[in-house]
């Protein structure tokens, strides 16, 4: 849990950098950084810059929920990509479930402007309900158009979450999500 890490100590920063460089040295090509809005921005900028000095192609993907912070996290702090949770995902989920017009996706992309290439579009992740679950769409086929649209109609990257390609329904879970403990 990132809230328990004491970022006020320089030793913490150095240890975090050591860990990042260790994994990069083994060939890991990037990190997904959880809830970046809760981590001190000064630390994030320093970490990203420090890792990229040695591994310039290393990728940092951030999970941020406030669209008003997207520009800062990409242009100022150095993230390569951000999950477009508050834009693409929230809109497309409502479109799939019949609660919004697909036109809003175009408005979202226009709003993001030059940041669109730094977005990571997705239909599922560990925090969200599975498309095929009864808590979401109830069928993976209901997301075909959204998948096609999200992957092909702009220059954002697209993430497939493990099991999504198989139509995983997560019906073993009470909330339509897949647990890391599911077998």
Model-derived regions: residue spans:
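Surface-exposed cleft-lining segments at the edges of enzyme active sites
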Residues: 131-135
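Short acidic/histidine-rich active-site segments
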Residues: 159-166
């Amino acid at each position: 849990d990132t809230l328990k890490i004491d970022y006020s100590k320089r030793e913490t920063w150095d240890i975090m950098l050591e860990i990042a460089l260790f994994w990069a040295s083994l060939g890991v090509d990037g990190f997904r950084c959880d809830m970046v809005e809760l981590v001190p921005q000064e630390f994030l900028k320093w970490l990203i810059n420090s890792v990229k000095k040695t591994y310039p192609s290393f990728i940092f993907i951030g999970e941020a929920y406030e669209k008003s912070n997207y520009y800062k996290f990409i242009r100022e702090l150095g993230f390569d990509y951000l999950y477009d949770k508050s834009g693409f995902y929230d809109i497309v989920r409502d479109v799939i479930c019949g609660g919004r017009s697909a036109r809003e996706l175009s408005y979202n992309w226009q709003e993001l402007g030059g940041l669109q290439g730094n977005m990571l579009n997705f239909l599922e992740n560990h925090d969200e309900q599975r498309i095929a679950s009864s808590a979401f769409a109830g069928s993976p086929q209901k997301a075909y158009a959204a998948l096609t649209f999200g992957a092909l109609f702009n220059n954002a990257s697209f993430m497939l979450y493990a099991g999504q390609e198989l139509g995983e329904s997560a019906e073993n879970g009470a909330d339509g999500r897949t647990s890391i403990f599911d077998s």
